[in-house]
Regions:
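Short acidic/glycine-rich loops and adjacent helix/strand connectors
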Residues: 1-98
Length: 98
């Protein structure tokens, strides 16, 4: 059976992450970027904006770390729940765009 390569995208709250994983369970990359505030905690709409703004760089770093390119990817997965709705929608939008 052919080994499959998955790009996993996570963005349920303050962290946006991208990982490349094989169907054998090998984690080839795990890159994350965290939305932070100086005071007051997570502002969901601002966290979602952060996720959209940094998604390309996080995904590119994940590919580089894994020594893979987009043509190597067989499937894309993304976090769906639980989480903050604006962040989940931003993450879904990134996955659909790909």
């Amino acid at each position: 059976m052919k080994e499959l390569i998955c790009l996993g995208i996570e963005g349920t709250a303050h962290t946006f992450g991208a990982s490349i994983i094989t169907s054998k369970g090998d984690i080839l990359s795990d890159v994350r970027d965290m939305y932070t505030t100086k005071k007051g905690g997570i502002i969901p709409q601002d966290a979602a904006k952060h996720h959209k703004e940094i998604s390309n760089s996080v995904i590119e770093k994940s590919f580089k770390e894994a020594n893979k390119n987009f043509d190597d990817i067989n499937l894309i997965s993304f976090s769906r729940a639980p989480g903050l709705a604006p962040c989940l929608l931003a993450t879904k939008d990134v996955a659909i765009r790909l």
